[in-house]
């Protein structure tokens, strides 16, 4: 998926805002996912997914750090996310529809915490980026 110069700018800018707070923001995105879509908790049955748990905080940080890695590799998402794609498809067997649900919650968190930066243009760019990340992650399901 080609990203325009303005897409790249907005994706990079939002990631730079997020990067110092990946644990906090990731935890909030995961908690929102679990609250709004309780069935997604089944993939984390081995973890304490209660509000404020260290496990949710760590998982949220892991998710956002992977997104940060992807944001630095916009032209090579397949390569950058290959191992993660394999893991989700073959080991974890996550329902690919859940990627969209998590992406939505990440966008909600961005809108809440960075209202000045989360302009309509930035929203569209980051949504496009997360859709590309999701598509890359579920590409190995075929």
UniProtKB/Swiss-Prot annotation:
SUPFAM superfamilies: Globin-like (SSF46458). InterPro entries: Globin, Globin-like_sf, Globin/Proto, Hemoglobin_a-typ, Hemoglobin_oxygen_transport. GO terms for molecular function: haptoglobin binding; heme binding; metal ion binding; organic acid binding; oxygen binding; oxygen carrier activity; peroxidase activity. Residues 2-142 form the Globin domain. Heme b binds at residue 88. GO terms for cellular component: blood microparticle; haptoglobin-hemoglobin complex; hemoglobin complex. It comes from the Eukaryota. Keywords: Heme, Iron, Metal-binding, Oxygen transport, Transport. Red blood cells. GO terms for biological process: hydrogen peroxide catabolic process. Belongs to the globin family. The alpha-B chain is a component of adult hemoglobin B. Heterotetramer of either two alpha-B chains or two alpha-C chains and two beta chains. The two major hemoglobins, B and C, associate upon deoxygenation to form a trimer of tetramers, BC2, that has a much lower affinity for oxygen than either component alone. This is Hemoglobin subunit alpha-B. It comes from Aquarana catesbeiana (American bullfrog).
